[in-house]
Amino acid sequence: MSVRVARIGKPHGVRGEVTVELFTDDPQARFAPGSVLSIQHARGGRRGQGSAADAREPLAVQSLTVTGHRWNKDVLVARFEEISDRNAAEAARGLELFAEVADLPLEDDEWHQDDLLGLVAVDLTRGEARIGTVKALIQGSAQDLLEITPQGGGRTVLVPFVEEIVPEVDLDRGLVLVSPPPGLLELGEGE
């Protein structure tokens, strides 16, 4: 299994460097020289029909090997063995980069985003009563949110993914333990 770690942005200069939109918490490790990342075309990326991007030849490779990276203000600029000039950098624009899960070590209290999908959310304030199933993890600037599809159907519930409200994720049992403040789970009811 692989997880998305970044998306290639616009070219930076004429020597094949590209900007990178990050989806990882550890860019130093993911973009270390020698790291190999598999590629996929982004869904709904900038390669819209009729655009100049349509005329670009796609890269004829399935993976990219990192040769280096640097920071330009708060933007990661990366170099890859397979991208040697601005034309190749332009052809790579919009590609999504993936790393194998086995290459992404985790601490004891960490998990990959995809591991959360499909877990059963239970309410600790009601004796582990089933709330529903985790549908998505929505990443936000202030905090992440778990989108939970209620067991009985209806409108999805958004639960702040913070330790005070979600004290534990138990992958072995397939559970997300939720300790909601009064009224949180009722916000989506009645619509």
UniProtKB/Swiss-Prot annotation:
Pfam families hit by this protein: PRC_RimM, RimM
Entries under InterPro entries matching the protein: PRC_barrel-like_sf, PRC_RimM, RimM, RimM_N, RimM_N_sf, Transl_B-barrel_sf
Gene3D superfamilies, alphabetized: PRC-barrel domain, RimM
Major subcellular location class: cytoplasm
Keyword Ribonucleoprotein applies: no
Locations listed in the record: Cytoplasm
Leader sequence residues: none
Keywords, in A-Z order: Chaperone, Cytoplasm, Ribosome biogenesis, rRNA processing
PANTHER family associated with the record: RIBOSOME MATURATION FACTOR RIMM
Quaternary structure (record): Binds ribosomal protein uS19.
Protein name as it appears in the record: Ribosome maturation factor RimM
Source species: Kocuria rhizophila (strain ATCC 9341 / DSM 348 / NBRC 103217 / DC2201)
